């Protein structure tokens, strides 16, 4: 059995480190190179102590990269697109974990990222990395733009309902509680422990960047408004979404939509239990896993539907999603290397 050789560019960050963790346990992958300009020469366990005993690799500089089968780019937004000529000849398959190649509309990219796209000619060569929506396009794909974490929690929650073609009478509101790891490994005033710990802080009331992905991927052109709140947790996103169904529709239709679209999905679980503590999705139960749990409650009197989605932002929201895409692209079992469940308690 020949394993594909993998290099991770930007492997000292949380996203790159999480892909590294998953890839080291994947039976079809062999991680041969991990880059970090700041930590070049240090063992990867210097930054990722959870990987002790799993690998003797050391970080290297990007200039030292050698050709591989799969190149994973885990760089700050903008870097992959601006420097893509340095990477494209290094691997047959390239997966980008940043936002650089997700958004196909150049005006939307400029609106939400504040600059013209640095490499617009490359956009059409990338498949948007959401397996539940783009499984067919991902088969055999050579370039994959992994979906954003908050966007994933919103898109997966709403897609079955918007696919129905129901004329929802009001705008859709999405509010996400986001763990601190979503901000990345670099420290800032906002991530300073005395400021972040125990705090629920709205950090993007309107104009969240992932709005562009949500609008691009969801059918129906419904107005969807995102608000992001920093939560005290380290991992996880819990998103609540509010929409109103028109007269003539009921909870039975909501159930039917989710069952029809997600009935056979390996990583989506519909959580709707009548009693007990765990009646709704909880991101704490998904730590380290590639699952997305979705639940809902319907107020028949007002027609309001509250949808809840939970993911681990570093796994289903980033690295696990990327590995799921790679499995599909290579024709492997989609769940390969991702079968594990979360932790409890």
Please tell me what each predicted stretch does.
Residues 1-196, 201-205, 297-300, 338-345:
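N-terminal Rossmann-like NAD(P) cofactor-binding subdomain of oxidoreductases
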Residues 14, 125, 149-156, 205-212, ...:
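Conserved active-site and cofactor/substrate-binding residues in soluble primary-metabolism enzymes
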Residues 18, 22, 156, 160, ...:
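Alpha-helical scaffold segments in soluble metabolic enzymes
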Residues 26, 221, 264-265:
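Acidic-histidine catalytic/liganding microenvironments
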Residues 141, 236-240, 304-306:
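Short, solvent-exposed beta-strand edge segments and adjacent coil->beta transition regions
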Residues 202-206, 229-232, 282-286:
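Short Gly/Pro-enriched turn/cap motifs at secondary-structure boundaries
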Residues 207-234, 238-240:
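Oxyanion-binding "anion nests"
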Residues 242-345:
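C-terminal active-site/capping subdomain that shapes the small-molecule cofactor and substrate pocket
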């Amino acid at each position: 059995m020949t394993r594909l050789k993998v290099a991770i560019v930007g492997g000292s960050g949380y996203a790159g480190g999480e892909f590294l963790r998953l890839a080291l346990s994947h039976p079809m992958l062999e991680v041969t190179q991990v880059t970090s300009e700041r930590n070049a020469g240090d063992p990867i366990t210097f930054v990722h102590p959870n990987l002790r005993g799993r690998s003797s690799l050391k970080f290297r500089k990007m200039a030292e990269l050698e050709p591989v089968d799969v190149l994973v780019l885990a760089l700050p937004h903008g870097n992959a697109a601006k420097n893509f000529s340095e990477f494209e000849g290094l691997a047959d398959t390239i997966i980008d974990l940043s936002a650089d190649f997700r958004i196909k509309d150049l005006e939307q990219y400029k609106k939400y990222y504040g600059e013209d796209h640095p490499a617009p000619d490359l956009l059409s060569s990338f498949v948007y990395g959401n397996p539940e929506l783009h499984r067919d396009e991902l088969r055999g794909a050579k370039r994959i733009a992994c979906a954003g974490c908050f966007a994933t929690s919103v898109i997966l929650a709403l897609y079955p309902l918007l696919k129905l073609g129901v004329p929802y009478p009001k705008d859709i509101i999405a509010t996400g509680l986001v763990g601190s790891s979503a901000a990345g490994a670099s420290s800032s005033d906002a991530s300073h422990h005395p400021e972040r710990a125990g705090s629920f802080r709205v950090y993007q009331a309107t104009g969240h960047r992932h709005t562009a992905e949500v609008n691009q991927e969801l059918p129906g052109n419904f107005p969807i408004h995102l608000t992001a709140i920093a939560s005290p947790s380290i991992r996880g996103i819990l998103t609540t979404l509010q929409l109103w169904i028109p007269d003539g529709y009921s909870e039975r239709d909501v159930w039917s939509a989710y069952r029809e679209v997600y009935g056979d999905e390996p990583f989506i679980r519909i959580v709707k239990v009548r009693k007990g503590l765990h009646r709704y999705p909880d991101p704490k139960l998904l730590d380290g896993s590639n699952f997305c749990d979705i639940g809902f409650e319907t107020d028949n009197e007002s027609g309001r539907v509250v949808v809840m989605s939970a993911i681990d932002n570093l796994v289903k929201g980033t690295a696990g999603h990327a590995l799921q895409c790679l499995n599909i692209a290579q024709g492997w079992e989609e769940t390969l290397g991702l079968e594990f469940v979360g932790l409890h308690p």
